[in-house]
Each structure stands twice: as structure tokens, then as C-alpha cells.
């Protein structure tokens, strides 16, 4: 597809901003993640009126927050000035990893993220859990876990969601 001109390979640098159009920019944000074949980045997408963090995968909140010297998730998101954060929701808990451990497949469980966040506050960004494994009970809109997320003021990603930036 690269040879056909469908994709263009562009090397990006952390902390640099890249224009996609006159009104849309992206900024790569390095996040700690098992370095199997390359480094790992989240992306901030900034539009004319709002911005979105795309963080589908990282290892552990402690590692990510320590990397940015942030005391908690809220302060880290505030430092990036994002309105919406699409965050790693791979597993609800480590119990979903049959035959493997969270050390082997590190993702912060949604249950841990909720413990760290608690209820959504007035100036918090909208947080949406994405990148869910097939074992994650958040897929079931009638599950207790799904209800817990929404009762705290956060959201569970759905196929076809759109965000106006």
C-alpha cells in the first residue's frame, strides 16, 4: 500500500506537532510500553475547538505517570490540555488473563483506572475506555462493570463513535 501511495511513512518525534490540515494537528506523546519492535506513542489530535488524546495501549499507570512526573491521571491529562481522552480499556481486571499474567501482557485494568479517577468532576476531560479485549465485560452494556463506568461519569467506547474537535 505504501508503493501504491495509499500510505506515506513519516518519522515523528515526541513533543513535535504535525499539521494534518489547516485546522488539525497531531502530537506524538511517548508512553512506556514493552518495547517489542519499536517505541510506543499516544497521540494528541487538536482541532479548532477541542483536543483528543488517543492512548489505546500502555503498560502501567505508575510508569506512565512517573515518566511525566505527574502525581495522578487528572494532572497528566490537564498538563496536555485535552478535552477527550480515549484510554486503554483492554482488560477490566487481571482475572481475564487465563494462562498468562499481567506482567506478560501489561495493560492497566479499567477497574484500577476507575479507582484512581473516582467520579468525574466538573473540569475533567471526557474519558472513554477503548481497545477492549473480547473477554472484557464492558462489551455488555447490561453488565455491572459497564454500569460502574457510566455511574462514575465516564464512557465505554462503541464502534462508530465520533467526536467533534
Predicted regions, residues:
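Active-site HxH/HxHxD metal-binding segment of metal-dependent hydrolases
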Residues: 1-4
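Core dinuclear metal-dependent hydrolase active-site scaffold
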Residues: 9-78, 160-165
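Cap/insert and terminal regions of metallo-dependent hydrolase folds
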Residues: 51, 59-160
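Active-site regions of enzymes building and remodeling cell-envelope glycoconjugates
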Residues: 6-9, 26, 151-156
Amino acid at each position: 500500500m505504501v508503493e501504491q501511495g495509499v500510505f506515506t511513512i513519516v518519522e515523528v518525534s515526541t513533543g513535535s506537532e504535525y499539521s494534518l490540515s489547516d485546522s488539525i494537528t497531531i502530537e506524538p506523546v511517548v508512553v512506556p510500553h514493552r518495547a517489542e519492535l519499536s517505541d510506543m506513542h499516544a497521540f494528541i489530535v487538536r482541532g479548532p475547538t477541542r483536543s483528543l488524546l488517543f492512548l489505546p495501549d500502555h503498560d502501567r499507570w505508575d510508569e506512565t505517570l512517573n515518566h511525566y512526573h505527574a502525581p495522578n491521571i487528572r494532572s497528566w491529562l490537564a498538563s496536555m490540555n485535552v478535552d477527550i481522552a480515549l484510554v486503554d480499556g483492554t482488560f477490566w481486571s487481571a482475572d481475564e488473563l487465563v494462562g498468562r499474567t499481567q506482567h506478560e501482557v501489561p495493560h492497566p485494568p479499567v477497574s484500577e483506572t476507575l479507582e484512581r479517577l473516582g467520579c468525574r468532576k466538573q473540569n475533567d476531560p471526557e474519558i472513554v475506555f477503548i481497545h477492549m479485549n473480547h473477554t472484557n465485560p464492558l462489551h455488555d452494556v447490561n453488565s455491572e462493570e459497564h454500569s460502574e463506568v457510566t455511574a462514575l461519569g465516564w464512557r465505554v467506547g462503541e464502534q462508530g463513535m465520533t467526536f467533534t474537535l
